[in-house]
From Swiss-Prot:
Protein name: Aspartate--tRNA(Asp/Asn) ligase
Gene Ontology biological-process annotations: aspartyl-tRNA aminoacylation
PROSITE patterns: AA_TRNA_LIGASE_II (PS50862)
Function statement: Aspartyl-tRNA synthetase with relaxed tRNA specificity since it is able to aspartylate not only its cognate tRNA(Asp) but also tRNA(Asn). Reaction proceeds in two steps: L-aspartate is first activated by ATP to form Asp-AMP and then transferred to the acceptor end of tRNA(Asp/Asn).
Lineage of origin: Bacteria, Pseudomonadati, Pseudomonadota, Betaproteobacteria, Rhodocyclales
CDD domains: AspRS_core, EcAspRS_like_N
Length: 599
C-alpha cells in the first residue's frame, strides 16, 4: 500500500511520487490550503492539499486527528524559511495527489501532545497512548536494545533455547504465580520467576552457552521499578571463571549501549559488597553522588548519650555519619523533612551536628541537642574521620546495621541530587562482588540465601557452610549503574554434595531437598561442568536509556502498581464452569485463597 515511511523522506527524494500510510497527527487550514501532518512509527511528514485538486481537497477538509489515511503525492522542497530541523523529513513536504480515508476516528480521549495526563488515564487508553511519539520512541529503542543483545550473544557462540513457562513451584524469594492443572486435580504449575534451574540443566546437558530474552513472573508488591511480569536477558555459560564471565558481560553491556544509544560507557570499577555497604549503605551505589558514610560505631561506646551508646554496644548495631559540605545552612524545616524521609526506612530519628567552628570541639563550635551528652574524644573522632570543616553538617544513623544502611543510603541519594553533590558523569557503572552467601532472618530464626540457593560459595569458604555460614562469601556479582541494579549473577554449584550442604544451611532437610530439587541433585551427579551466568533486567536497562520515570513507560502493556491491566480489566472473575473444570471452589467470603479438590 505504501512506498515509504514518513520518517524516511528527505531531500534526496525531491520530485519523486511516494505513497504514505499513517495517521493524521494534526490538520491545519491556512487560507484555502490544508496541511496534514501524517504520522507513522518512523516519524512525521507534512502533506499539502491545495484546491486545484477538488476531490482530494474535499476529502482533506473532512479529515480530523487520528484518521487513518493513505496519501500519494510528489516530494518537493519546503518554501524558504519553513523547514523544520527537528524532523528527519523537515526539508521537504508532499504535494497531495490522492488521499484515501482508510478508517475515520472518533474524538480521542486526549490529544497526543498533552503533558499533564494521569498514568491511569494513559493505561486505560493504552492504545492511544502508544501512538504518542515518546512512547513509540521508547518501544523502538527497546527493540534496538534487544537486537543488540541478540547480535552480541549470537556472535559469541550463545544459543537461544526456550525453557518452560509451566513449571514447578520452588522457593526463590518471591511468591509464585500458580496455575491450577485441570488434568491433575489439586495440583499446580508455577509461572517461572526465572529460568534458573533449566538453564543450569542445559549446561549439564552440554549446550555450553545459552541465552534467552524471556518473560519472568513474581507475585510481589510493586514499586516504580517492578512489574509482576518482566523481561530479562538470561545468560548461562560453562567452563568460565567468575572473572571471565564478568569480562564477557562487561563487553556485552558496552556493545549494547553503543549500538542502542551511541554511548561509550566509562570503566567498570569493582567493589566488594562490604565496602559498598560501609561507604554508601547500598549494594548498588550511585557513584555519581559524592557523599559517603563514615563508620563511627566504636567512638560512641562510652558516651552518656544512651541512644548512641546502646547501639554501639549491641550486636549488629551500627552508627554511621554522613558529612554534608556546607550543610550548616540547612533550615530546621529541611532537617525535619529529612528526618521524616528516613522514617520510611525504619529509622527512629535523624541526629545531626552543625559544625560552626571545626577548631572548637565543644558546644561553642558544634551545634546540636546531642553535643552535651557526647565526649570530646568521640566528637573529635567524628570530625577527624568525616573530614568535617566549618560550615558543614553531619547526619547520624544509629540502629541495626540494615536500618542505618537503608536510611542513610537513601538519604545520601536524596540530598546528593537535591543539593548538587554529584559528579559531571552521566553514567557510573560498578561491579559489586564478594557478596555474603547467607543473611540471617530474625523473624524466622534461620539463614536465607542472599542471591539464590544455587550460588557457589568461594572455594576457600566451603568449610564455613557448616561451621559459620554468616562468614561464608559467594562467587556472586552484580552490575550496578547510576544506583540501579542492571543485572546480577554468580558461579553456580556444580557438585551435588556442595548443593546438599547449602540446602542444609538453609534449613532445607533431605526429604524436602528431594521433593523440590531432586531432579537438580540427580543431574549434578552426571559430570556437571563448572558453570555460571547472570541475568539483566531489560525493562530497567531501557528505562535508564530513555530517562523514563517508570518501567511502565518502556513496556507496551504494563500492569499498574496494584498489578492490574486497566486496558483489559485483568485480573477478572471467571465463570463457575471454568472453576469446576479446574476443581476449584471459591470461599463464600471472597478471598485470595481457594479450596482444591471440590467439584
Amino acid at each position: 500500500m505504501r512506498t515509504h515511511y514518513c520518517g524516511q523522506l528527505n531531500a534526496a527524494l525531491d520530485g519523486q511520487i511516494v505513497t504514505l500510510c499513517g495517521w493524521a497527527h494534526r490538520r491545519r487550514d491556512h487560507g484555502g490550503v490544508i496541511f496534514i501532518d501524517l504520522r507513522d512509527r518512523e516519524g512525521l511528514a507534512q502533506v499539502v492539499c491545495d484546491p486545484d485538486r477538488a476531490d482530494t481537497f474535499k476529502i482533506a477538509e473532512s479529515v480530523r486527528n487520528e484518521f487513518c489515511l493513505k496519501i500519494t503525492g510528489k516530494v518537493r522542497p519546503r518554501p524558504a524559511g519553513t523547514t523544520n530541523a527537528n524532523l528527519a523529513s523537515g526539508e521537504i513536504e508532499i504535494l497531495c495527489h490522492e488521499i484515501e480515508v482508510l478508517n475515520p476516528s472518533v474524538t480521542p480521549p486526549f490529544q497526543l501532545d498533552e503533558d499533564n495526563l494521569s498514568e491511569n488515564v494513559r493505561l486505560l487508553h493504552r492504545v492511544i497512548d502508544l501512538r504518542r511519539p515518546q512512547m513509540q520512541n521508547n518501544l523502538m529503542l527497546r527493540y534496538k536494545t534487544s537486537r543488540a543483545f541478540r547480535r552480541f550473544l549470537d556472535d559469541n557462540g550463545f544459543i537461544d533455547i526456550e525453557t518452560p513457562m509451566l513449571t514447578k513451584s520452588t522457593p526463590e524469594g518471591a511468591r509464585d504465580y500458580l496455575v491450577p492443572s485441570r488434568v491433575h486435580p489439586g495440583q499446580f504449575f508455577a509461572l517461572p520467576q526465572s529460568p534458573q534451574l533449566f538453564k543450569q540443566l542445559l549446561m549439564v546437558a552440554g549446550y555450553d552457552r545459552y541465552y534467552q530474552i524471556v518473560k519472568c513472573f513474581r507475585d510481589e508488591d510493586l514499586r516504580a521499578d517492578r512489574q509482576p511480569e518482566f523481561t530479562q536477558v538470561d545468560i548461562e555459560t560453562s567452563f568460565m571463571s567468575e572473572a571471565e564471565i564478568m569480562a564477557l558481560t562487561e563487553k556485552l553491556i558496552r556493545t549494547v549501549f553503543k549500538e542502542a544509544i551511541d554511548v561509550d560507557l566509562p570503566d567498570f570499577p569493582r567493589m566488594t559488597y562490604a565496602e559498598a555497604m560501609h561507604r554508601f549503605g547500598s549494594d548498588k551505589p550511585d557513584l555519581r553522588v559524592t557523599l559517603e558514610l563514615t563508620e563511627v560505631t566504636d567512638a560512641f561506646k562510652d558516651v552518656a548519650f544512651k541512644v548512641f551508646a546502646g547501639v554501639a554496644n549491641s550486636e549488629g548495631g551500627r552508627i554511621a555519619a554522613m558529612r554534608i559540605p556546607g550543610g550548616a545552612t540547612l533550615t530546621r524545616g529541611e532537617i525535619d523533612a529529612y528526618t521524616q524521609f528516613v522514617g520510611i526506612y525504619g529509622a527512629k530519628g535523624l541526629a545531626y551536628i552543625k559544625v560552626n567552628d571545626a577548631s572548637q570541639i565543644n558546644e561553642t563550635g558544634l551545634q546540636s541537642p546531642i553535643v552535651k551528652n557526647l565526649s570530646e574524644a568521640s566528637l573529635k573522632a567524628v570530625i577527624e574521620r568525616t573530614g568535617a570543616q566549618s560550615g558543614d553538617l553531619i547526619f547520624f544513623g544509629a540502629d541495626k546495621a540494615k536500618i542505618v544502611n537503608d536510611a542513610l543510603g537513601a538519604l545520601r541519594i536524596k540530598i546528593g541530587h537535591e543539593k548538587g553533590f554529584v559528579t559531571g558523569a552521566k553514567w557510573a557503572p560498578l561491579w559489586v562482588i564478594d557478596f555474603p552467601m547467607f543473611e540471617y532472618d530474625d523473624e524466622s530464626k534461620r539463614w536465607t540465601a542472599c542471591h539464590h540457593p544455587f550460588t557457589s560459595p568461594k572455594d576457600e569458604h566451603l568449610d564455613l557452610l557448616v561451621s559459620d555460614p554468616g562468614k561464608c562469601l559467594a562467587k556472586a556479582y552484580d552490575l550496578a549503574l547510576n544506583g540501579w541494579e542492571l543485572g546480577g549473577g554468580s558461579v553456580r554449584i556444580h557438585r551435588s554434595d556442595v548443593q546438599e550442604k547449602v540446602f542444609s544451611a538453609l534449613n532445607i532437610g533431605p526429604e524436602e531437598q528431594q521433593a523440590k530439587f531432586g531432579f537438580l541433585l540427580d543431574a549434578l551427579k552426571y559430570g556437571a561442568p563448572p558453570h555460571g551466568g547472570l541475568a539483566f533486567g531489560l525493562d530497567r536497562i531501557v528505562t535508564m536509556m530513555t530517562g523514563a520515570e517508570s518501567i511502565r513507560d518502556v513496556i507496551a502493556f504494563p500492569k499498574t502498581q496494584r498489578a492490574q491491566c486497566l486496558l483489559t480489566d485483568a485480573p477478572s472473575g471467571v465463570d463457575e464452569k471454568q472453576l469446576r473444570e479446574l476443581h476449584i471452589r471459591l470461599r463464600q467470603k471472597v478471598e485470595t485463597q481457594v479450596e482444591v479438590g471440590q467439584p
